[in-house]
Amino acid sequence: MVKEKKKADKKGEKSARSPSSLSDNLDFSKQDGNTTRQEMSPAGVPLLGMQLNEVKPKKDRQNVQQNEDATQYEESILTKLIVESYEGEKVRGLYEGEGFAAFQGGCTYRGMFSEGLMHGQGTYIWADGLKYEGDFVKNVPMNHGVYTWPDGSMYEGEVVNGMRNGFGMFKCSTQPVSYIGHWCNGKRHGKGSIYYNQEGTCWYEGDWVQNIKKGWGIRCYKSGNIYEGQWEDNMRHGEGRMRWLTTNEEYTGRWERGIQNGFGTHTWFLKRIRSSQYPLRNEYIGEFVNGYRHGRGKFYYASGAMYDGEWVSNKKHGMGRLTFKNGRVYEGAFSNDHIAGFPDLEVEFISCLDLSSGVAPRLSRSAELIRKLDGSESHSVLGSSIELDLNLLLDMYPETVQPEEKKQVEYAVLRNITELRRIYSFYSSLGCGHSLDNTFLMTKLHFWRFLKDCKFHHHKLTLADMDRILSANNDIPVEEIHSPFTTILLRTFLNYLLHLAYHIYHEEFQKRSPSLFLCFTKLMTENIRPNAFQIKGNLFREQQRTLYSMSYMNKCWEIYLAYCRPSAAPPHEPTMKMRHFLWMLKDFKMINKELTAATFMEVIAEDNRFIYDGIDSNFEPELVFLEFFEALLSFAFICVTDQMTKSYTNVPADDVSGNKHETIYTILNQDAQNKSPSAVMSHESDAAHSDSARSSSSKLELSPDVNKIRKSEPKIKKSVSHERVSKMNFKLTGKGITFFSSESKKYERPKDDREEEFNTWVNNMYVFFVNTLFHAYKREEAIKEKIRADRLRSTAQAQQRKMEDDELEARLNIFILREEEAKRHDYEVDITVLKEPADVSSSHLILDPPKEDVTVSPSSKTITSKKKKK
């Protein structure tokens, strides 16, 4: 028996230990919602300073911490136990099969044994009441199990070496706290969701690192306010979006330790009735420092006015540019939220921006300046809110008739203003989801649809021609003349109609007066009234299909730009002709027996009778993006057969139900992020409200700025509920969160014919755009990239060969020069050698006379010597 005790003690329980408290560090962080936001707008924007009510009192925090400390189980206490008694089977003296063991100190185990070890299903109860039910592997709690604490708290999920590790859920009994997600070594780590109340209205879902909120996550506070973005050390830190539903405000941008810091966008939503006079929101886009507007930034007012300049502690201070609601501009210095030099200008300034101040305007020496700037001294019958820009049109008439022309056309606009407002509101809402403040802003895409519905293009003008006409009077970058994301205010919409009316009908009324009035009246009579509200094309006909089609819009815009070419007409902006469109489809290998060139022409000419009459075709007209995109939607039904859709009938349910649909404003914001900072900042008040008109979206949307916005947005990560498959589910009840295990329910497709038709349409769209068009574009771009790489490689190789040839040639030249130098040197040596004998002989010839004496004397000596001998 002693031997059994030692074996059970040494082998069995040295590594098993109870986990630490699952409620440790529940993180009722002060940064979750009590940051006071000092966001008072000097122009009557509601006060932002408020405390969110999600933070627990300090006393509660202490109680929670005490409860946490009271349930810490970090020590390995099983190694101190000795088996006192055992009931069950034995094999060769070792515990085997099902049995019950009691240990010294009061701990017990009931379950399966194998070779003397706790192995298999079992229940271990500590002396203090903590209970573990689940799997054991050689005396160690492993795989799946349930911990139950004496106070009623419980954990169910994966266990590794006695620690919570993997996926599991925890529910605290002393506090209304529940967590479901991933664990590592007994701590929340990975993706998980924590609920702070029984109702499930206060929660956090996202990334955890060692019990700390860190990474990407969504925090919903008890008040309903929501933060979505990056976290660091339990605080909002990085890129994120906060929506204050209680005050109808939203901030998207940079955070540092729970406070707005860096570049961001703050929007104030105002509830309005339908057909409100002002379709915009009060919005600030710029730099923040410690929650204040500080640095460079733009403030867009709901009236259409805009301030672009420097800010200091929420006040305009420094150089700035103020655009009034009528389009007039003041540019100069500001001091302490006033125009420099006019310290008593504040009340008039607020009044002229149509922001309620609660104080009646008072006269001052600056009133005359304001009347000139905001147009209140103007005698226009349209009032100061709308000022028609007729300078270019009036220049076409003699100066003597210009006042009468202007007056009569203003009367004409005034008579039709109600109908024009209704038209503007109707078309600007196409393709848009729910608006938080019941307002919509027209984009160029909506405007094109209006022009085609009213048959403006039947007057020998394409939509591209109209864009060029309308851009002549605006400082619009060349690459944005045909952008579908350009926004259009009501006053801009009216100005556009007047300019187009003149270009279409001026020849007919050039000899009659008032000519401009007659042009506009005929435009209203023959084009607008009979045809407005009758939506043609296949993009905006049905709301649900429109929202789904928008999900493909950004990629199609990218493809459209890739195949545009400079226009032949000034200012030579990039456009796409019909022949370019057809060539593109041919390159994509999409021209086949289903989609022939003739079918292509029929689809394009369906809304334009001047392109194709059944015999002759005109491939020269330019296509704007609306025509390009609607043609692709039509091609989807032609190219995709029933056999192709059969293999794609299981489109995700979220796509079918519309949960992932994008509105035109969501796409507009995404497009603005892709623009260069210079392009974005160059917009004036009529074209720079891309972000201000967006509807609520589940995606993190950031506004761009020079050297401020990060190039990479945090990616929207999958929620924990999407990751667990047939593991653990939970539901909200009146008493809190109930956890249960079940199989995932399969999505059942409704049997209704209308739903079936819509599902078929969705499948067609998916097959055509994702599997056909986008795949072909990707393949073509890969080929082009390979060609470019090959060309670069060939160029580099040619340059390398040229360098090698040049080097070889240089070496040969050097060798030849050296050879020539050597030959020349040898030649000089030979010449020197040849010259030396000649020099010697010549020297001998010169010295001959003296040598004659020398030659004679020896002979005389010999003669004399002979005489002496004799």
From Swiss-Prot:
MORN repeats: 86-108, 109-131, 132-154, 155-177, 179-201, 204-226, 227-249, 251-273, 284-306, 307-329
Top-level taxon of the source organism: Eukaryota
SMART domains the UniProt entry points to: MORN (SM00698)
Compartment annotation: Cytoplasm, Cytoskeleton, Cilium axoneme; Cell projection, Cilium; Cell projection, Cilium, Flagellum
Chief location category: cytoplasm
Compositionally biased intervals (Polar residues): 17-39
Biased composition annotated in UniProt, kind: Low complexity: 693-703
Protein name (record): Radial spoke head 10 homolog B
Species of provenance: Homo sapiens
Gene designation per UniProt: RSPH10B
